[in-house]
């Protein structure tokens, strides 16, 4: 493979991975701006509707150290296709469901695959370039994380308020389906080259710095999600602003993030 061809392949890979991370984060974070709409659509209280965010986040927290480990020896393309397929199917079901319990299930199942896809996206980006360029490659993928918060939340809020909750779920489905097809047809097979034993991988859990990092991430995200999840309901209840204004405020908040 020539250098120019390899560079084109890497650019395409980075684009697909970045868009994939955006789709995954968009599915996770997009609903935080439409909690009141979910409550109204499914006839539940706002705190109950908040479980669409809390349940997703809790499952990620507990599955993140385990699920990537279980799939660490499987072809990376296969794993990404599996994760994206779960997201597409779950999002598609959420488009049509009128049952709140079913909605929670469609939120819970893909949450297990969230850390799986995101971890592979970051590691694949880093390993696809030289060691010197790895930080730059990872930063590109992280743009998908930022976009999920900066664009995903306000866009979802706007779509749900102007059309319907189902329309917002269609948005989730289309983004993830596009990435799924791009992954299937444009990304080559990526077998795992270095297969570490599960014991070797688990040994990292003995490092205090890891648990300190876990705690810091837990506290930061708990504060952010706690504020972010109920911001729209607070603004509607206290200030009586429209969802168009809320979408703009969510965009500003996402930019600050």
Question: What is each residue range found by the language model?
Answer:
Residues 106-144:
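Cytoplasmic helix-loop-helix junction between adjacent transmembrane helices
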